[in-house]
Every structure is written in structure tokens, then in C-alpha cells.
Swiss-Prot record:
It comes from Synechococcus sp. (strain CC9605). This is Phosphoribosylformylglycinamidine cyclo-ligase. Pfam families: AIRS, AIRS_C. Its EC number is 6.3.3.1. Its main location: cytoplasm. The keyword Acyltransferase does not apply. One of its GO terms (biological process) is 'de novo' IMP biosynthetic process.
Length: 345
């Protein structure tokens, strides 16, 4: 008996590393020291920083992986993984530095795994961060054959005096919503139940334009790092930011609001994508659950002074991100939790 007969193919692992090497190295920034194969990834801080703060985040893709693996779509979930981590850390105004990934599978499928890593590398390039290292664990008997799970870890950096922590937010500020690409990577346990109820498959289409349902559900999560860095470098005054993930607007926008502030949202200020209407109708999902599960077309929020709202929206559109003024900050009794008016509580 040997390791391969026990379910772990070391040679396939080596071939996999060689296949992904070029994609990984293409993400490297000038600060990266060394290459693949070491026990740890090495990277220096960007030159010229005065008082840098490191910002870290970790996340996964959830049960979107189940749907992606059923339909042989692997590259997109790699982008999703980067987006779920990077979109969190950039809310502080930090620029992504490096990313690490962890993949676990029952049996290494080099082609599928390579597609995932190539997607991760794609997301890293779009976000300006280096894919500094990773781990692929082959765990026969623990994961089902042909199934894998992935997790990501991101570190970003911001000057201490440029940190955006929401403390400058005040009543009267404007809330700008930046468009999502669709469901992103949250709510897929509910999505999969709706698909099951509707007997949907790879050939199912929806909406007036008869769009491919599965294709739209698996659209990669939008990356906002380049947009945020552009806004900061353009001198836009950003008081706060929120990544709209699980819990939707009602549970994520309040996370960036300081004590004494709430927000009023105008749900008619943007057009809810047809995909969410299909999910609601096919699954008979109550309106409140829809708001507290999905992003409903808003993947990221920017809180800015009212005088800056038009300029910020124009900057967003100039970077190919659709954006709308969706609400404003209101006052709240100190000590009370921030709430959103205009959406189901």
C-alpha cells in the first residue's frame, strides 16, 4: 500500500503546482520577495509609507460552490473568493497587499483546481494584490469525490491618517449605492432551494430577455478595490463604506454608521435586477427575507458629504460601476442601534 492507493496523488499535486505557477507569479507586486515553494510568502511594505496600518480579512464562498461544481464552473468562484475578502478590507480605505488561499478536496482534480486558482489570480490582478501563497489539501474520505471547499485570506494597508472608520459620518451625509453583478456569494442555500422547487436546470431561462438563469446566478462577485482606490486618489471625501453581503442592506450599512446615526433608504432609487424578482416569485420569498438575505442590486455603499454625491457618482460611472444616490444619513438617539428607514426591519 502507498499514499496514492490511500487516495493522495502526490505527483498530480506537483503537476498542479506547475500549471498554476505562471498565473500566480503574474499577480506579484514589486514588494514580493521570492517565489512559490517556500514555507512562507515574503513581502515588504510599499516604500514611503509613514505610519502604515495592516487590515486583514478572511472569508469563503459558501454554498455557491455547490451550484458551481454541479455545473462545472470553477474560474468564477476563484474571483468570488477574492472579492469576498478584498471587498471587506477596502471599506477601511486600505489597499490590498496580498492574498492567501486554502483549498480542500476529496481527490485532486488538477484541471478544476487550476481553474479555481486562475480565477483567484484573476481577482488578485483586478484588485492589485499579490497571490502570495496557498495550500491545497487532498483529504480522501473526508470530502466527497469531486467536491472541494475554498477559503481566502487578505491583508491590506492604509496610512493611519487616511483610515476610514465611519467616525466622520454625520446626519445629512449621502448614501451612494454601487451596483452588484447579481447575487454575489451570499444567500445560495436559499437560492438552491428555490431552484429545486422550480425544477430549474442548466437550460432554464428567465425574464423578458430569456437570460440563462444558472449563468447569471454564477456571475462572479464584483470587485470594488480599484474603484475605492480611484476615489481616494482623486481626492473624493469618503466618510464610510459598507460591503453588502449576508444580511443585505439592513444588516450591513448600519455596521459603518457611528453612534447617533441611522440612515433612510429610498428603495425606488434603483431598479431591482430581474434575477431577484424571479427568485422571489419562484420561491415565494417574503419581502423582508429578500432584503435580509440578498443585496438586491447594491453590492457596495459609499457614505459621502452631500456636496460630493454628484462627483462621486460620476467617478463611479467613469470606472464602469453603475451607482445611484439611494439614501441619506439621519440622526438617532445615542445608545440606540443604527436602523434603516425605508426597508423592512
Amino acid at each position: 500500500m502507498d499514499y496514492k492507493s490511500a487516495g493522495v496523488d502526490v505527483e498530480a499535486g506537483r503537476a498542479f503546482v506547475q500549471r498554476i505557477k505562471a498565473s500566480v507569479e503574474a499577480t506579484h507586486r514589486p514588494e514580493v520577495i521570492g517565489g512559490l515553494g517556500g514555507f512562507g510568502g515574503l513581502m515588504s511594505l510599499p516604500a514611503g509609507m509613514r505610519k502604515p496600518l495592516l487590515v486583514s480579512g478572511t472569508d469563503g464562498v459558501g454554498t455557491k460552490l455547490e451550484l458551481a461544481q454541479e455545473h462545472g464552473s470553477h474560474h468564477g468562484v476563484g474571483i468570488d473568493l477574492v472579492a469576498m475578502c478584498v471587498n471587506d478590507v477596502i471599506t477601511s480605505g486600505a489597499a490590498p497587499l496580498f492574498f492567501l488561499d486554502y483549498m480542500a478536496t476529496g481527490a485532486l482534480a488538477p484541471s478544476a483546481m487550476a481553474e479555481v486558482v486562475e480565477g483567484i489570480a484573476d481577482g488578485c490582478r483586478q484588485s492589485g494584490c499579490a497571490l502570495l501563497g496557498g495550500e491545497t489539501a487532498e483529504m480522501p474520505g473526508f470530502y466527497p469525490q469531486g467536491r472541494y471547499d475554498i477559503a481566502g485570506f487578505c491583508v491590506a494597508v492604509v496610512e493611519e491618517d487616511e483610515l476610514i472608520d465611519g467616525q466622520r459620518i454625520q446626519p445629512g451625509d449621502s448614501v451612494i449605492g454601487v451596483a452588484s453583478s447579481g447575487v454575489h456569494s451570499n444567500g445560495f442555500s436559499l437560492v438552491r432551494k428555490v431552484l429545486e422547487k422550480a425544477n430549474a436546470d442548466a437550460n432554464t431561462v428567465y425574464g423578458d430577455n430569456q437570460r440563462p438563469l444558472i449563468g447569471d446566478l454564477l456571475a462572479p462577485t464584483t470587485l470594488y478595490a480599484d474603484l475605492v482606490q480611484h476615489l481616494m486618489q482623486s481626492g473624493c471625501e469618503l466618510h464610510g463604506m459598507a460591503h453588502i453581503t449576508g444580511g443585505g442592506l439592513p444588516e450591513n450599512l448600519p455596521r459603518c454608521l457611528p453612534e447617533g446615526c441611522s440612515a433612510r433608504i429610498d428603495a425606488s432609487s434603483w431598479t431591482r435586477p430581474t434575477l431577484f424578482r424571479w427568485l422571489q416569485e419562484a420561491g415565494n420569498i417574503p419581502e423582508r427575507d429578500l432584503w435580509h438575505t440578498f443585496n438586491l442590486g447594491i453590492g457596495f455603499c459609499l457614505v459621502v458629504p452631500a456636496r460630493s454625491e454628484d462627483a462621486v457618482i460620476e467617478h463611479c460611472r467613469g470606472k464602469n460601476h453603475q451607482a445611484w444616490l439611494i439614501g441619506n444619513v439621519t440622526s438617532n438617539t445615542p445608545g440606540n442601534a443604527a436602523v434603516l428607514e425605508g426597508v423592512p426591519a
